[in-house]
Amino acid sequence: MAYGQKILKGDAYKRAAIKRRHIRIRKNLSGTAERPRLVVTRSNRHIVAQVIDDIKGHTLASASTLDTSIRGGEADKSAQAKQVGALVAERAKAAGVEAVVFDRGGNQYAGRIAALADAAREAGLKF
């Protein structure tokens, strides 16, 4: 261990690992106007999906479990993630986006992340 390096335990260690993976992934990913980046951010309670044009630095479309159309519905988090995926795909298509680059945000491609991605694909987004 390097001098001055903190020893992380529990949830802090998990968050640090996710952050490291996200940095490593983002080195090779970038969204353009033709193919913006679909970013997925997951917490213990909520999931957020944003379609971002990295060149301009603008968010073109977004959806989350905090939206009123999703908030009161399903109790199952995977079902909520599917709804978020379908909603962000619908909003992205309304903004003129057909294809995206998927950024899983350092999370494993499983569970809620995979459910959101599959729902977005079924709704017509290509990635």
Curated annotation (Swiss-Prot):
Domain of life: Bacteria
GO biological process: translation
Family matches, as SUPFAM superfamilies: Translational machinery components (SSF53137)
Record-linked InterPro entries: Ribosomal_uL18_bac-type (IPR004389), Ribosomal_uL18_bac/euk (IPR005484)
Any one cellular-component term (Gene Ontology): cytosolic large ribosomal subunit
Keyword Coiled coil belongs to the record: no
Pfam families assigned to the protein according to its UniProt record, in alphabetical order: Ribosomal_L18p
Any one Gene Ontology molecular-function term assigned to this protein's record: structural constituent of ribosome
Record keywords: Ribonucleoprotein, Ribosomal protein, RNA-binding, rRNA-binding
Protein family: Belongs to the universal ribosomal protein uL18 family.
Subunit structure: Part of the 50S ribosomal subunit; part of the 5S rRNA/L5/L18/L25 subcomplex. Contacts the 5S and 23S rRNAs.
Function (record text): This is one of the proteins that bind and probably mediate the attachment of the 5S RNA into the large ribosomal subunit, where it forms part of the central protuberance.
UniProt cross-references to HAMAP family, sorted A to Z: Ribosomal_uL18_B
Stated name of the protein: Large ribosomal subunit protein uL18
Organism: Streptomyces coelicolor (strain ATCC BAA-471 / A3(2) / M145)
